[in-house]
């Protein structure tokens, strides 16, 4: 069959939740396209869930208020907690320890956010995706299928696709684009060809910090993924911690022409380390405002400097202004053996690839964090680069996430509508309700 009601790009949380809610609203003949052989984007990486309207969504971007956001989060939560392997890891009700950490952070002019959090782990990612897919009865998946172009033909849209070197066309009344972070650059270009308006928003650029788990247990035993938000004194820029993984691993994200650093945690097997991202929000104006290309330039530079791999540097070396090297990387004399790397990155100097302003901001924030949680700056602590979050392409939409082209809706991280699994799922629900109400009453 090549005729559908809704054509969905991307099988991540935004795409899947759009399909689930469309079916609940009585819409059938749904198709999901993904160039990967297995769905489903961010759902396969770690499975960390933050249920707090201050994390993962922008109320103004989604044109909803706090109450609407909380209601949507409850709807998303009900889907996740029915999965048996998804467990709550941060309890916020009447938690005096959270209040104590908030007070300590406040003494250093740092904002501290402790959301209700659940986790199912990378090792359970495919099981969770299968659990979601099992609820879909009127949705067809086209995996390993690349969408080459989108065309408007009369009152319907045409996807020109390629699979196994063969081309085929699929038609639909409406389109939901949720390309994910890895597909953001591609969809930005392909959408412009059919007249969809988009612009550049801020991008997050930084590092992943890995340290001996004991140095961070005091906070992660209370809040699994603590959120610290800094505003630097020197430049007045925003830096935040993100995606903390107690007992986790450092991993990579593969893109077409570079690799980015990331981190995750398994449900059943833990390491002796903890890792978290420390990222600087960057906005650009004239004459160069393309934050996507800015991030890609940094990523490609690290790809060259690291010989095809991300770069890692010990804080002990960083403080002395020298690069890390293989010969001394695990030196007992320098106390580097306290934290063994969980990913084989290239030892080097992260300051060669990051702009000086970003390095200044990250270092200032690390020093402040060490005052809140002493032990962060142990010489053995590892700094991996680059960690870049491509949430930066923004699409102008109405409150149902429909673009300026009738029938084309967007959702998820890759279109600037969310930052993380829960936010992506929420944007998918909003889009599904908009599609059903306008086109399938």
Where in the sequence are the language-model features?
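Dinucleotide-binding Rossmann-like beta1-alpha1 core, especially the glycine-rich loop
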Residues: 41-91
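Residues forming the flavin
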Residues: 2-57, 61, 96-441
């Amino acid at each position: 069959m090549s005729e559908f009601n809704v054509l969905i790009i991307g099988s991540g949380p935004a795409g899947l939740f759009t399909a689930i809610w469309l079916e609940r609203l009585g819409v059938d003949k749904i198709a999901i396209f993904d160039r990967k052989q297995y769905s489903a984007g961010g759902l396969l990486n770690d499975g960390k869930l933050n249920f707090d309207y201050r994390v993962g969504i922008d109320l103004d971007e989604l044109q909803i208020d706090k109450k609407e956001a909380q209601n949507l989060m409850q709807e998303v939560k009900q889907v996740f907690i029915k999965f048996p392997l998804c467990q709550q890891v941060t309890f916020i009700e009447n938690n005096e320890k959270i209040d104590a950490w908030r007070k300590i952070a406040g003494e250093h002019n740092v904002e501290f956010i402790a959301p209700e959090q659940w986790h199912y782990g990378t090792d359970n990612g495919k099981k969770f995706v299968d659990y979601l897919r099992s609820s879909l009865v009127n949705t067809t998946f086209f995996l390993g299928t690349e969408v080459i172009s989108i065309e408007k033909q009369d009152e319907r849209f045409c996807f020109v696709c390629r699979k196994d070197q063969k081309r085929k066309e699929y038609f639909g009344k409406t389109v939901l684009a949720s390309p994910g972070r890895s597909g953001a650059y591609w969809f930005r270009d392909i959408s412009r060809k059919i007249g969809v308006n988009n612009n550049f928003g801020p991008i997050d650029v930084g590092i992943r910090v890995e340290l001996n788990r004991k140095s961070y247990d005091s906070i992660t035993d209370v809040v699994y993924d603590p959120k610290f938000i800094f505003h630097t004194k020197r430049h007045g820029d925003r830096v935040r911690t993100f995606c903390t993984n107690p007992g986790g691993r450092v991993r990579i994200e593969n893109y077409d022409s570079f690799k980015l650093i990331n981190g995750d945690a398994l449900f059943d097997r833990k390491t002796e380390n903890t890792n978290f991202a420390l990222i600087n929000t960057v906005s650009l104006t004239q004459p160069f405002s393309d934050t996507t290309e800015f991030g890609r330039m940094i990523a490609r530079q690290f790809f060259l400097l690291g010989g095809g791999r991300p770069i890692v540097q010990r804080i002990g070396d960083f403080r002395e202004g020298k690069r890390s090297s293989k010969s001394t990387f695990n030196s007992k004399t320098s106390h580097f053996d306290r934290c063994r790397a969980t990913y084989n990155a290239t030892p080097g100097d992260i300051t060669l690839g990051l702009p000086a302003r970003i390095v200044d901001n990250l270092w200032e924030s690390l020093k402040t964090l060490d005052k809140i949680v002493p032990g962060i700056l142990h010489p053995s602590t590892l700094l991996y680069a680059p960690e870049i979050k491509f949430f930066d392409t923004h699409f102008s939409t109405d409150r149902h996430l429909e673009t300026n082209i009738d029938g084309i809706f967007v959702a998820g991280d890759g279109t600037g509508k969310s930052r993380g699994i829960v936010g992506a799922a929420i944007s998918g629900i909003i889009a599904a309700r908009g599609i059903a109400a306008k086109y399938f009453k």
